[in-house]
């Protein structure tokens, strides 16, 4: 009966442990939604899938769980000791046997310092996971917007190819009487421009495949899966205040938070090292039984002894070395945090400038350069059809508007990529902070 109860209890413990692991997984409704690869369209589709499927992020998550379990173990006492003794050769007078149970208690404050160290390390592991999650999100968004830019650029070039082919037809129509097998200068210029754009389009298509490969690697998807062209969301970029960004960064950046917890863990380790000079206390009970040979159990005598023991911390040189090493580690981590903060602030300053500058360039292309280039192209195209402009001028105007449109898409992608990096550095979304 007792064996059956133990088996049932074991099954229940296993089930509860599995439930606990399942509950411990990152919990986000958007993340947990399984998205079919051919349905990836928005950044939310990509980042949500990556956060639940990326192998590297899962590995760091398990490191966090391991550190959490170690923190729980650090609060426990050492295992009690059990000893049993009897005489190898029984005497003719008495038969003697004894049982000893001992529990060691670390010196006052040792367990607390050890537990604080483990808890701070677990918090640091949590922040490391959060930093890895934000880095993955930034990388996915960077590749997403690059993929979107390349898709738009390919479409723009295809539209320009159609326009150039129209110019070629116009050039042929304007000079129909030519020797067989010869081309007019206008058609030569037009076809040269077409060939150049076709080569440019092929290069962008290859680059698009490379970018899609990076996305599939981040999402842990097979290489043979085809990702659809991503869709841009309409957005109105707003200037980010650098002082606000710095405040958010110092409060929420997970890398800095993780290093802060590591500093606290190192200081707790110093406290623990300082207590190595103090002994640990052991309390035990010894039960001894004696009886004459042939006597029954009721005629035996039992003695109980309370035991007190102490460890002897004699090797003080090793304790001093341990303390110095703990102090050195704490100082090193403090300096590491200072260097990390300075580096992150410098990076944030540069990216914030690029982000705000891109907003100005977005307005310049959208409101001034592209509309004026389109107006100029219409005027030159009309003049060319009427014979009042040459093909070189027309091709130049067409190339100018294509370059403006490509630059506009480039600056849109740069703006979104810079925002993704700023959000990673700040440790939070910045659209809600505007």
List where the protein language model places each region.
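Residues on the lipid-exposed face of transmembrane beta-strands in outer-membrane beta-barrel proteins
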Residues: 99-103, 215, 308-312
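Amphipathic alpha-helical coiled-coil segments
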Residues: 47, 59-74, 132, 136-157, ...
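Bacterial Sec-pathway N-terminal export signals of envelope proteins
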Residues: 22-81, 85-86, 105, 119, ...
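Periplasmic alpha-helical coiled-coil/stalk elements that build and connect Gram-negative outer-membrane
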Residues: 7, 129-251, 351-354, 358, ...
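Acidic, low-complexity, intrinsically disordered peripheral segments
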Residues: 2-7, 23-29, 35, 407-434
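Small/polar (Gly/Ser/Thr/Ala-rich) solvent-exposed segments
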Residues: 58, 77-95, 105-131, 151, ...
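Bacterial N-terminal signal peptides
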Residues: 9-18
